[in-house]
Design a protein with these regions (language model features):
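Formylglycine-dependent sulfatase
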Residues: 1-125
């Protein structure tokens, strides 16, 4: 992107981690995460977020599409992102952002979706 007013977007979604263990969220356990704390201080921190689904793939799909699992058909971990579904990474890529996917995916399997990522380093369970 050449426009200096265009923000950098770093989206971090942890799997099976409660915010209540982090010092960042005033936890009694208080696990220190200095890098996350610095990022949160400079960006957006969600204070009242609730997962749309207890399973990881439907929850990720909901966050990426802005739709509930029942509306995308992704209600189980075995049911992945529908082909040609509109989602955040598609929108970012279409608007000139450089995109990357690092870590656990389990959402995007269609080649049309995977091509949206300039950098991809996936891990599994």
């Amino acid at each position: 992107m050449t426009n200096n007013s265009t923000p950098n977007v770093l989206f971090i979604m942890a799997d099976q981690m409660k915010a209540s263990i982090l010092q960042l969220y005033s936890s009694e356990i208080g696990i220190e995460t200095p890098s996350l704390e610095r990022l949160a201080g400079e960006g957006v921190r969600f204070e009242h977020a609730i997962t749309p689904h207890p399973l990881c793939v439907p929850a990720r799909t909901s966050v990426m599409t802005g739709r509930y699992p029942h509306s995308t058909g992704c209600r189980r971990n075995e049911t992945l992102m529908p082909e040609n579904e509109q989602h955040a990474f598609r929108i970012w890529k279409e608007n000139g952002f450089t995109t990357g996917l690092i870590g656990k995916n389990h959402c995007f399997i269609e080649s049309s979706d995977l091509k949206l990522f300039d950098v991809r380093c996936e891990i599994s369970h």
